[in-house]
Each structure stands twice: as structure tokens, then as C-alpha cells.
């Protein structure tokens, strides 16, 4: 078994009703899942994948592989009634805000992670516990494994839910994202794709370049980006907004340039996107 170091940042709780891996199907959460499958750490009771409906096809293909008997525990899918992109373009302003790059500078507010990731996962947890949406669950009943790695330790924060205790296996294992890649390569596992919505403004040029290699997905994102600056949307968003950090239309953005800006996924502190 791998030697884990519980401390003030992350710790194991004794005898929870449910141990669940928050599975983003990216490199970090995949590494945790496969470490459990190989017996290097204890196995969770299950994993939950929150499906926004807008992940890259490569993520869904990787998820299907994980579901093919690779893991000794089930993967449950938590999915809202409609995809995030559908809600966004339908004008669901309260439920579907993503962090656009604002033409005048800065980024807009967002609630996409909470409404398309956090809430569906919590609803699924309640379902697995046999508790309704308003039923009581004792504090500390659930140990939720989050795929934040050592190099992203600033993303850590409490669950914000009394009955869910966030645990960070990779922090306890002292593993960075690069350590995860090395662990996977040493055991001849495929390199997982980056988990995120295809139109996520947090991604840098590497993400956009990877997306452009999938023509259908690239065309979909180009159309969403252009739609953002149609007159009705300019009025809705009180100005021009963009998906690319350069604040120009994505079709014109220099995605060949090196990524030298901040890692915007560091703004996503729940640990359910990009992992």
C-alpha cells in the first residue's frame, strides 16, 4: 500500500457511510482511480462523474474505458437535464454563467461549476445514501476524494457541505500532476485527456490547439464564441465577451502562441474541473 501522509490539509475519516471519488476523468482523478484498482490505496465505494454534456469526445471515450471493467468499483453518472451549452444559449442566466473574458478586461462571474458539477454530485450522493433532497445526513457521513495534486494545493477548500468531508489523496501521497503522468507511464497506462467543457474560458492555448484537432468540436466552439457577440447577447452581457483570453474572436486568436499567462484553472477551487 502507498504511504499516505494525513495532516491538517487532508485526512482520512473513520467509518463514513460512503467513500466516493469525484471522477473528472482527467489525469489526477484517473490516477487515483487506478491506484485504487491496483491496491496501492484503499478503494472507494464508488466514483461519480458529473457530466455537463460538453466534455471533449476524448474524455467520454476515456470514461468508457474506465467503465469497461478496469475499476473494481462502480462509476455513477450525475447529469443535469440539459447540457450546459444548451442552457447557456437558451438564456438561463441564473443557472448557466461561465467565466467569459470581458472585452473591457477581467472575467465575468460564473456558476457553471456549482450548478453542473457540485450540485449533481451532491444529488447523486444523497441518492446513494437513500436520502431525499431535504433529508438529514449526519456531519462527516461522506468522504469525498478530490483530484487536486500537490502543485495545485492552493485550490483546496472545504466542501461547504456539513455531511461531506473532502479528502485529497494526491496531497497525502505528495504527488504533483507530473508525478501522476509519470505514475501512469511507468505502468503503461494511456495518458488521460484534459477534463473540461470544450468551450471553457479557463483553458489556455494548448487546450484550444488540442480542440482544433477535432473539427466538429472546434466548429461548435467557434459558433458559440461568435454567438456571444450577436446584438442580443451583447445587450445581455453588457458588452463584448470572449472565450479566448486575448479577447479576440476565437477563430482569429493566436492559439499557436505559447501559454505564458496564469493557470486559470487555479481559479476553480472545488477540484472538480480540469482533474
Region locations from a protein language model:
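Nucleotide-activated chemistry modules centered on ATP-dependent adenylation/adenylyltransferase
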Residues: 1-275
Amino acid at each position: 500500500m502507498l504511504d499516505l501522509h494525513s495532516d491538517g490539509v487532508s485526512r482520512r475519516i473513520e467509518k463514513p457511510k460512503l467513500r466516493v471519488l469525484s471522477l473528472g476523468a482527467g489525469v489526477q482523478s484517473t490516477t487515483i482511480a487506478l491506484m485504487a484498482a491496483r491496491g496501492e490505496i484503499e478503494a472507494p465505494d464508488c466514483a461519480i462523474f458529473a457530466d455537463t454534456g460538453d466534455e471533449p469526445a476524448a474524455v467520454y471515450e476515456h470514461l468508457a474505458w474506465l467503465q469497461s471493467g478496469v475499476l473494481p468499483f462502480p462509476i455513477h453518472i450525475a447529469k443535469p437535464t440539459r447540457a450546459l451549452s444548451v442552457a447557456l444559449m437558451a438564456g438561463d442566466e441564473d443557472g448557466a454563467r461561465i467565466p467569459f473574458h470581458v472585452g473591457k478586461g477581467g472575467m465575468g462571474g460564473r456558476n457553471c461549476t456549482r450548478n453542473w458539477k457540485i450540485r449533481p454530485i451532491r444529488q447523486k450522493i444523497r441518492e446513494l445514501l437513500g436520502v431525499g433532497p431535504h433529508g438529514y445526513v449526519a456531519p462527516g457521513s461522506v468522504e469525498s476524494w478530490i483530484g487536486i495534486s500537490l502543485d495545485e494545493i492552493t485550490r483546496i477548500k472545504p466542501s461547504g457541505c456539513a455531511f461531506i468531508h473532502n479528502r485529497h489523496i494526491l496531497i497525502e501521497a505528495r504527488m504533483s500532476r507530473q508525478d501522476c503522468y509519470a505514475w501512469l507511464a511507468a505502468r503503461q497506462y494511456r495518458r488521460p485527456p484534459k477534463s473540461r467543457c470544450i468551450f471553457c474560458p479557463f483553458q489556455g492555448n494548448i487546450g484550444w490547439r488540442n480542440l482544433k484537432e477535432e473539427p466538429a468540436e472546434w466548429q461548435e466552439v467557434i459558433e458559440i464564441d461568435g454567438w456571444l457577440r450577436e446584438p442580443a447577447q451583447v445587450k445581455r452581457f453588457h458588452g463584448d465577451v470572449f472565450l479566448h483570453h486575448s479577447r479576440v474572436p476565437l477563430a482569429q486568436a493566436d492559439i499557436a502562441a505559447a501559454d505564458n499567462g496564469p493557470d486559470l484553472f487555479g481559479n476553480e477551487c472545488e477540484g472538480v474541473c480540469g482533474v
